[in-house]
Amino acid sequence: MTISRNYPFNDVYTHVLGYVSQPNEQEILENEIIQERFVPGMKIGKLGLEKRLENHLIGTNAIQRYEVNAYGKRINQLEHQKGEQGSKIRLTVDTEIQKACGELLNQKAGSISVMDIYTGDIIAMYSSPSYNPNLFLFGISQDEWQLIRNNPLKPLINKTLSGLYSPGSTIKPIVALSALENKVIDTKFKVKCTGKMELYGQTFHCWKEKGHGWVSLKNAMKQSCDTYFYEVARLLGVDRLNITAEKFGLGKKVLGEYFDTEKKGLFPNTKWKKNNLGRGWVLGETLITGIGQGYIQSTPIQLCMMTAQIANGGCAIKPKIIVDSNPISYEDAKQSMESGLLFDTDSEELLDKKLFKNQKNIKIVQEAMFASTNERFGTSYKSRIDDPKYQFAGKTGTAQVKRISKRERELDLELEQIPYKDRAVSYTHLTLPTICSV
């Protein structure tokens, strides 16, 4: 009798769990535990958490040996060893929310991730289109494999963790925060937008051809004025911007300890270009970095984490998808952040959580993003929710996408956050492109 894994939710958890299938010779040789416990028909994790946690999930085989007569009838039991189940691992993911994410994406290319802004728990992480992992349990047919493999929307790629995109104007909250933190600007600082900026013979255009006129930080964020952020980036410089961006999780893996396919992305600085491209940084590159284009590459989960840390008031969080052995509740996490203390629940070590020099600067950015969604002429005003219990802040943008199998194309990005609630959502739509963090 063969007992096998079953995935009752079909394609809902595919890019979180991965799947199991029979190991090949190399996989057996590379893992001592699998070597010790291998029996014909055994299945191991091939992808996702199934693969990363294989040594915890694998159990020990039960053994029963019998003496039989010439007719094959058992006459005496010689040995009986009880098998043991593998470890039970509980995820932070909420199945109903995960299913709802899949329904929203409806097999279109994109991703949605939901993160608790205080505990860092991943509440949902859905990459679309998905596929049914049960197909791999007993060997997928050639026709079924080719159907998945040749799908132009790339269901085999976990877009939340492995999709690299230019964040576009969704980066503007970090640009604003960095400039405020470094005292380059304040709330009174204004720029006159005529629809373009001339610099050393180059023209850098704002998305609004006729310009926005004189704009302050709040109005520039609300209307996503490129000219304002060109000037702010010019005054700030890419190196100081890089420091702030990396503090908030850009250019770093978010869930790398769980998923070996996650990409770290890139937030460039002058040293990176010199070391990797052998050329010096030019000022025009700073300007386009300030509106989220150029060399920047981010994953949706990074944008989710970035926005979560803005939403919670500028406190560092440790994203996780496995429930801690001693989990901290949402209420306790929120209270500890507000009191200035937060512990890593696994190690009980104090986290260095303050990501800001002046908390007023976080508040200024939150209010500017709130205006973008809830005030007239805001770029995401049409997405607003009038009920005060569910109001959120947001940032829209358009950027060039870099995909593994697609040429560059236009991508709309939208970051949304609920600054006074408990979740951050990252949403990326790749065919009719959009990103949100709520």
Each language-model region and where it sits:
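Extracytoplasmic/periplasmic proteins that interact with beta-lactams or build/remodel peptidoglycan
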Residues: M1-S111, Y126-K159, L164, E331-E348, ...
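Secondary-structure boundary/capping signal
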Residues: N24, N61, A109, F189, ...
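Single conserved hydrophobic/aromatic residue that forms the stacking wall/gate
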Residues: H429-V438
